[in-house]
Amino acid sequence: MSVYGLQRLYIAGAHADATSGKTFDTFDPATGELLARVQQASADDVDRAVASAREGQREWAAMTAMQRSRILRRAVELLRERNDALAELEMRDTGKPIAETRAVDIVTGADVIEYYAGLATAIEGLQVPLRPESFVYTRREPLGVCAGIGAWNYPIQIACWKSAPALAAGNAMIFKPSEVTPLSALKLAEIYTEAGVPAGVFNVVQGDGSVGALLSAHPGIAKVSFTGGVETGKKVMSLAGASSLKEVTMELGGKSPLIVFDDADLDRAADIAVTANFFSAGQVCTNGTRVFVQQAVKDAFVERVLARVARIRVGKPSDSDTNFGPLASAAQLDKVLGYIDSGKAEGAKLLAGGARLVNDHFASGQYVAPTVFGDCRDDMRIVREEIFGPVMSILSFETEDEAIARANATDYGLAAGVVTENLSRAHRAIHRLEAGICWINTWGESPAEMPVGGYKQSGVGRENGITTLEHYTRIKSVQVELGRYQPVF
């Protein structure tokens, strides 16, 4: 018997049965309890979702921007009214502490929808004079039907981040959440419908990567926005391009450097490093997992980090005092433990954690102790590869040039940060770091106004910020001739 029963698809403004005959299960990562059995979409279901999205999108795009804005604002109100109930659902599905899901996941998702609701009326074209009797004007028009493919670490937030600019610009979206955390996207779909979004404008199809592939290759879809791992992102991008030259946005992985200079406030630096590695049990794509510390202050910094790690409150996600929960799945647990074993084998010095937690109520959950490695080298797997778990690698450096060169020596380029009291050094270093999101003397905040995305193999395009609206519209250029037409022949 599951907690939430059988979960279906959401197509054309209502829950709908899948035709595949297949289901998959989703579990509470803190207890192992079966949360729900979820129907998996078939190719026919994806076709049905695309057809309803096309129909709904025509109605949605025909509305005025102000009408769309008001409907999206109503969705924001509903999200905020139901914050606690949605936070509990997200807690059960992801394993995150309730204190975190109440304060972050739904709140930040609603903020992004509110932000784009305010920008819906600001989408406009240009007028360009050519001659006294001729001019050009441009229109920004919606793309049509877009697909969003989400990751398992921030299910409802990602659904909001992807759908908000798409809908604000007059598009429809078919969203596929991760099969690891599939539940909250259905609640967002219900809220959009209740707020007045036309049927079909936000559909949810459930399933594994095969469903994502169907969306990526579907000729009726104009754009794919994907959040997840690099290798999967490459496959999505390949399918999107080969099928119909779709627009793509890719928010992919990272192995982000945090550089602590010798003039830094070390208490502040330790606070930043612990947050940048252990928030959401380390399951954040922007985490600063490569912590470069200038040699002169390394020992003092490590002492402060370990003192803070010792204060982390690992516990039941439902306990309001807990600030560190389990990993999202058994597969992720195995992956993280494998990397920890690799760090030990390659000679990194284990300073904290380094094992699965199995005592008391942890035994049935996917808990790994917050782990800190010292004396790390750039060639170690724990330093080179994305772990997506609570594993911090501390490395030392001597000079600024050395730190920048080593920080940039990666295929990733999602985020980076520096901690220093020297403002000139801070900006100089940030300007040289090859990353799309950078922080100075802080870490991790991604407000709606701030574009989010990576360099190199960490992504293509951006989410959030005004610039993202450009990626959900296409430009039509129109020349108007007021005078006599001059024939060529």
Curated annotation (Swiss-Prot):
Pathway entry: Amine and polyamine biosynthesis; betaine biosynthesis via choline pathway; betaine from betaine aldehyde: step 1/1
Cofactor note: Binds 2 potassium ions per subunit.
Assigned keywords, A-Z: Metal-binding, NAD, NADP, Oxidation, Oxidoreductase, Potassium
Enzyme class: oxidoreductase
Catalytic residues, chain numbering: K162 (charge relay system), E251 (proton acceptor), C285 (nucleophile), E463 (charge relay system)
EC number: 1.2.1.8
Catalytic activity: betaine aldehyde + NAD(+) + H2O = glycine betaine + NADH + 2 H(+)
Source species, domain of life: Bacteria
One of the protein's GO biological processes: glycine betaine biosynthetic process from choline
Binding positions (NAD(+)): G150, A151, W152, K176, P177, S178, E179, G229, V230, E231, T232, G253, C285, E386
Keyword Phosphoprotein: no
Positions with a binding annotation for K(+) 1: T26, D93, V180
InterPro entries recorded: Ald_DH/histidinol_DH (IPR016161), Ald_DH_C (IPR016163), Ald_DH_CS_CYS (IPR016160), Ald_DH_CS_GLU (IPR029510), Ald_DH_N (IPR016162), Aldehyde_DH_dom (IPR015590), BADH (IPR011264)
HAMAP family: BADH
Family, per entry: Belongs to the aldehyde dehydrogenase family.
Protein name: Betaine aldehyde dehydrogenase
Gene name linked to the record: betB
